Amino acid sequence: MEGYIADAKRQYGDLADTFLKLYPVKSDADVPLMRAQAQNDEINWNMRQWAVAQAKAGKKAYTYFFTHVQNVNGQPSPAGATHTAELSFMFNNPKGQANQTWTDVDMKVADQMSSYWANFIMTGNPNGKGLPQWPEYKSLTGSKVMVLGDAPQVEPANPSAKLQFYTAAYQRMLRSSTN
């Protein structure tokens, strides 16, 4: 836990207290989960920045969150839906990851995801016949994202305190690199 706090202070400086409020730990056992959550949120922040840049350039962008928890050795993954966990689903590849055991729900998720990806590759738009509508992402406020879980659903993508934190952290990093 002490290393986690020291890392936050080293990486975020005057923003460390905000980071530690957003990703609190009470014991060493909490550290891996909070590190993983912070990593996912930072990736989310980056993804949304790219989507906004695409929209500003007049291009279409589609964002998603993968929340489906796969089974590993017959049990839900204790790490949850982690970064890159969606790869075997987007390619409809049930043998994509070692020890992954697929259920009927997994097969449905993979079929829908791979259809979205194939549509996007062919047309630049993930939407297609029989799939829930995936909205374009246009701005940090008011846009909606596709949540790819046990069943796809669209949710608001309003800025959260975590996204605001990463905006401030990156601005801080840019300022320090120009000094």
PLM features per residue range, with description:
Residues M1-D104, Y116, T123:
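Substrate-gating cap/lid region and adjacent catalytic-acid/histidine neighborhood
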